[in-house]
Amino acid sequence: MPRQSPPNLAKLIALDLLTVGRVPLLLLVLIFSCAMGVVFMTHHTRQAISAKDQAFMERERLDNEWRNLILEETALAEHSRVQQLARKDLEMKRPDSDKEVVINLK
């Protein structure tokens, strides 16, 4: 009489899962894949929210810089300042009234 080897437990469990336990195995795989999908979507949502917050902060910074540039432009274009720079740096002066020429456009 041939001697029987002891049954392999892992082989029996795998065979049982593939024959009798197909539906529970399929449900287990679906549950794990759904859980991984939730983790994946949560991660990407958090990344998108972080990127949106950074974009808003950059927008605030650029808006402040824009306001400062408008103020600087207004200060630099002030008439009295331009007149003072023309006299001092460029040595310009207002022409005499007899040297002014008026041009009429038709």
UniProtKB/Swiss-Prot annotation:
Periplasmic side: 44-106
Gene Ontology biological process terms in this record: FtsZ-dependent cytokinesis
Highest taxon, organism lineage: Bacteria
Keywords: Cell cycle, Cell division, Cell inner membrane, Cell membrane, Membrane, Transmembrane, Transmembrane helix
Protein name as it appears in the record: Cell division protein FtsL
Record's subunit section: Part of a complex composed of FtsB, FtsL and FtsQ.
Main location as per UniProt: membrane
Family: Belongs to the FtsL family.
Entry membrane topology: Single-pass type II membrane protein
